[in-house]
Amino acid sequence: MPFGRRVSGIVHGLALGGVLYSVMVVTFVIVLPVIWRPVWVRWVVRRAARVAIPIALAGARVRVRGTGVEYARELERGRGYILIANHASNLDPMALIKVLGRVDLAFVAKAETLRRPLLGHMLRACGWFGVERESPIAFKRFQEEVQARRKAGWIPNLVVFPEGTRSTDGQLQPFRMGTFLLAARCRLPILPVVIRGTSPIHGRNAFACYPGTVRVDVLPPIEPPGKLSAAEILDAVAALQKKAEAIYRAVPDLNRVDGDLPSPALAPSESVS
């Protein structure tokens, strides 16, 4: 890689991380000590993030283009949803927040991410959930928490990366079943979102960030199956997972932002039975 491009990547990486962390740290140090109610803390931190993320992306010269936001708006007014997206970069959550900035997104992350000293505290304050990936007990507790909070009036706008981790090359990895099991058991629609272009700009475990364009396409929702018996649910979940994964497999290259999404990515909303 040419020396000038390496320097550019470091400079823009500093701009991205520096702005984002500075705003969030100032929020924690100055504002949060005088606020004690968790709901107020979440409100302040989320709005600080919505201010910081566009500024950080602009400083790094990363443009985010979005389509299909109306699908999220419609579901937000009803029973909520589980937003799924492919995952290749730390830019992915920022791009989602930039496009869906008026939606209170609750990200579901690896539990170890929320145990990091400063970052984890910030993410928990934003309302993120941490789930142990390989623990059925932890997943069951998370499902019960979602259902209990829904009964109390909470409309879940959950964000899950069903690959379970970031891709090393930007291309799709196999989906895990847990996301779709949660959708079936909680009767929540799946909202597919295709993110393109983040890996070449800011790859996995990379500090450098290069100027470029990210595209976020929100697609029509997939309705969950109806009420099922214990014997039927696994087949229905497998069908839901297969349908969702086919949307992403239809995209020729997740590292390229040019062109519209092909069918079946743009198929109309339908239920899985």
What are these regions (language model features)?
Residues 71-75, 115, 136-140, 222-228:
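A short acidic, often aromatic-flanked loop/helix-cap motif at beta-alpha or helix-coil junctions
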Residues 3, 7, 140-273:
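Non-catalytic C-terminal accessory region of glycerolipid acyltransferases
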Residues 1-81:
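Membrane-anchoring hydrophobic helices of lipid-metabolizing enzymes
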Residues 31-50, 59, 75-136:
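Catalytic core of membrane glycerolipid acyltransferases/transacylases, capturing the structured
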Residues 66, 129-132, 224:
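Short acidic-hydrophobic, aromatic-tinged amphipathic segments that line or gate anion-handling sites
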